[in-house]
């Protein structure tokens, strides 16, 4: 028991330290390098699934989960267990055989090695942490009990849209690495005989764009970003197009001073197309202030809130399929 507690404390220290370093680094980049290109050396060697049966023409829904650490999964499993009923936690732990996830987190730091695995509580940024895929799977499995849903998760904790997903408004290092991941997996699904279509992109990002200079550019950056996504992924798009489901960021101290500007940019962008969906995590009551008790991790959602984040994503995914 003590060993597990010590391990949890160590993991929290690592994540918190990493978040602080990135935040400080981004402040410097914002002041001194806002209009300078930044190139990351990304690993684009992706393994392809060997655990899927032949598709034989089976139609499958594919959902992309993209963003930074709250998409990676930095919420604490032990608090989810503490605050859930035994029946609910048993369901989350057992996983969802009809909702499979292939994930690459933080440039292969944590990944499924190309395999599609049942979503459970082990798909987060580190051992003992989970992401929004759990709430997504809980809702998607209930909505589509006789179907297989695939989640492709590609996230980079602590990196900005302005400097890293994009660079000077063009496709940047993270975007290009993600695109290889997505294309190779979609082509592999086709080669296995699946009729796989991307129906929605769930985007949980913006915390690292909250220096005011980056926040002021978020609307233009997101407009470019989503146009690239739809252009590059068009061959794999579901009938009716790819929905972009965009979560607002929190109003916690790590999102000062620019979170109102970022969230307003997200809201404005959602008005440009019926395929763009925005929801406010602040209005939804999602908090970052309670866990761990006594020393909260202000950057990441409390466990039940991370679960709800995934459920809200799934709600909009389900509604998007009804509207096609």
Protein language model annotation of sequence segments:
Residues 5, 18, 30-32:
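Intrinsic low-complexity, intrinsically disordered segments enriched in polar/basic residues
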Residues 20-23:
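C-terminal motif of bacterial Sec signal peptides marking the signal peptidase cleavage site
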Residues 1-10:
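Bacterial N-terminal signal peptides that target proteins for export
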């Amino acid at each position: 028991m003590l060993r597990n507690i010590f391990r949890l404390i160590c993991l929290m220290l690592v994540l918190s330290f990493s978040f602080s370093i990135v935040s400080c680094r981004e402040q410097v980049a914002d002041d001194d390098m806002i209009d300078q290109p930044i190139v990351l050396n990304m690993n684009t060697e992706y393994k392809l699934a060997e655990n899927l049966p032949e598709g034989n023409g089976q139609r499958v829904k594919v959902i992309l989960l993209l963003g930074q650490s709250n998409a990676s999964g930095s919420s604490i499993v032990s608090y989810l267990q503490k605050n859930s009923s035994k029946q609910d936690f048993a369901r989350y732990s057992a996983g969802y055989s009809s909702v499979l996830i292939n994930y690459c987190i933080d440039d292969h730091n944590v990944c499924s090695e190309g395999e599609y695995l049942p979503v459970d509580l082990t798909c987060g940024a580190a051992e003992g942490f989970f992401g929004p895929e759990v709430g997504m799977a809980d809702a998607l499995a209930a909505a589509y009990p006789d179907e297989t849903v695939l989640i492709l998760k590609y996230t980079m904790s602590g990196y900005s849209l302005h400097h890293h997903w994009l660079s000077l408004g063009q496709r940047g290092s993270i975007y290009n690495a993600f695109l290889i991941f997505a294309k190779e997996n979609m082509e592999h699904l086709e080669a296995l005989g699946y009729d796989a279509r991307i129906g929605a992109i769930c985007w949980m990002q913006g915390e690292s764009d909250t220096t005011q200079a980056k926040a002021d550019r978020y609307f233009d950056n997101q407009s470019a970003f989503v146009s690239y996504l739809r252009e590059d992924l068009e061959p794999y798009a579901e009938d009716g197009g790819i929905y972009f489901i965009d979560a607002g960021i929190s109003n916690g101290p790590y999102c000062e001073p620019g979170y109102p500007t970022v969230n307003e940019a997200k809201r404005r962008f959602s008005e440009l197309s019926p395929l763009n969906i925005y929801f406010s995590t602040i209005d939804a009551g999602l908090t970052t202030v309670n866990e761990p008790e006594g020393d909260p991790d202000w950057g990441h959602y409390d466990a039940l809130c991370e679960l709800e984040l995934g459920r809200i994503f799934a709600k909009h995914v389900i509604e998007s399929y009804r509207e096609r």
